[in-house]
From Swiss-Prot:
Gene3D superfamilies: Translational regulator CsrA
Pfam families recorded: CsrA (PF02599)
Localization, UniProt: Cytoplasm
Primary localization class, coarse: cytoplasm
Keyword match RNA-binding: yes
PANTHER family with a match to the protein in the record: CARBON STORAGE REGULATOR (PTHR34984:SF1)
Family: Belongs to the CsrA/RsmA family.
This protein's UniProt keywords: Bacterial flagellum biogenesis, Cytoplasm, Repressor, RNA-binding, Translation regulation
Organism: Syntrophus aciditrophicus (strain SB)
Protein name per Swiss-Prot or TrEMBL: Translational regulator CsrA
NCBIfam families linked to this entry: csrA, PRK01712.1
């Protein structure tokens, strides 16, 4: 992990397209601004983890449904 020190108004640039700027510091809270192309998703860590969990659940559900449909189709073919 790269650790950088920044002052208010200073930025960090990631690649050619992402810029992160330190906007405000109040006590333990830090406000940052993220400037990135619309095609790049930007989420808080906890939101990203929730999205990943939901995607995993949806995938597992799709696999289970696919297996059930395959079993039903096999039974229909036998009849």
């Amino acid at each position: 992990m790269l650790i950088l020190t920044r002052k208010l108004g200073e930025s960090i640039v990631i690649g050619d397209q992402i810029q992160i700027t330190l906007l405000d510091i109040k006590g333990k809270h830090v406000r940052i601004g993220v400037n990135a192309p619309k095609g790049i998703a930007v989420h808080r860590g906890e939101v990203y983890e929730m999205i990943q969990d939901e995607n995993k659940k949806a995938f597992e559900s799709d696999v289970k449904n696919s297996e059930m449909l395959s079993a039903l189709w096999a039974q229909v073919k036998i009849l």
